[in-house]
Amino acid sequence: TDFGEWEGLTFSEAAERDTELHLSWLGDTSVPPPDGESFDAVAARVLGAHQRIIAEYAGQTVLVVSHVTPIKTLLRHALDAGPAILYRLHLDLASLSIAEFYPDGAASVRLVNQTAYL
């Protein structure tokens, strides 16, 4: 995810720096940070890759290693959840989440934010 001018800032710092934009960003997944990428843009990119992986590796187990927002996007997709999950779901660094996607389009989330192995 490209957070643009907010990259490296804490959540509070971004809110203080761009108060109105930050509020808009929190309420609308189509709003990007300054010079950054919206959550909708991330979802389009991630779900496109998801479809390519499903097609290429049908019936196989695939490990995807990524950053927080793409993982949250895949979990959101698997749960058929709304955008609020992007702001309410915490994922630790190096955590393990497991979502299974089936040929009929169904999905199941088996594990989220597991860190016991660390």
Where is each model-derived feature located?
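Acidic, low-complexity terminal tails and accessory targeting/binding regions
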Residues: 1-16, 55-61, 76-118
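Phosphate-handling substructures
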Residues: 1-47, 111
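A short alpha-helix capping/helix-coil boundary motif
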Residues: 30, 75-76
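Short, charged/polar low-complexity linear motifs in solvent-exposed/disordered segments
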Residues: 40-42, 51, 89-91
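Generic structural signal for well-ordered alpha-helical scaffold segments
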Residues: 43, 47-55, 75
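Short basic (Lys/Arg) and small-residue
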Residues: 67
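Alpha-helix capping/helix-boundary segments
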Residues: 70-71
